[in-house]
A protein has these predicted regions:
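Post-transcriptional modification and biogenesis factors for structured RNAs
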Residues: 103
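Conserved catalytic cysteine-centered active-site region
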Residues: 123
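N-terminal, polar/charged subdomain of small-to-medium soluble alpha/beta proteins
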Residues: 1-95, 109, 116-118, 131
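Short Gly/Pro-enriched loop/turn and capping motifs at secondary-structure junctions
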Residues: 106
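Conserved small/polar residues in nucleotide/adenosyl-binding loops
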Residues: 134-136
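Glycine-rich active-site/cofactor-binding loop and its immediate structural neighborhood
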Residues: 100
Length: 136
């Protein structure tokens, strides 16, 4: 079984040492879906949510979150991000929204967590902004 790199031989958590790794361009992509009622999705698409343009705010929140990943994932390295993009595409047939992110940096460690964080927070933002339309 492979050894978990975030724990020492005694089982204590530690941040992985990447100081000897070569600096290279790193790119990661992530994606996810938010499912909702068709009426809710139509309200979002018609920009009838009083809080604002759901997709634009979700993109901004995803970008902001990707830059804060090391603050919320304890053993994630703080990195300098060169680029973050988010795309949000509605799928009316399946009553869902497809979210993708792409994150780029030049560094010694990857940006997978930043890409996943961007999608996760964008999805949470979409859900939060639609809460007033959701009947639980």
């Amino acid at each position: 079984m492979p050894k978990l790199t975030h724990f020492d031989d005694n089982g204590n958590p530690n941040m992985v040492d990447v100081s000897q790794k070569e600096t290279t361009v790193r790119i990661a992509e992530a994606s996810g879906y938010v499912y909702m009622e068709k009426a809710t999705l139509n309200t979002v698409l018609n920009k009838e949510i009083s809080k604002g343009d759901v997709f634009q705010i979700a993109k901004i929140s995803g970008i902001m979150a990707s830059k804060q990943t090391s603050s919320i994932i304890p053993l994630c390295h703080p990195i300098i991000i060169d680029k973050v993009t988010l795309e949000i595409l509605p799928d009316l047939d399946k009553s869902r929204v497809f979210i993708t992110s792409s994150v780029t940096c030049r560094g010694a460690t990857g940006v997978e967590m930043e890409a996943l964080t961007a999608v996760s927070v964008a999805a949470l933002t979409i859900y939060d902004m639609c809460l007033s339309l959701i009947h639980i």
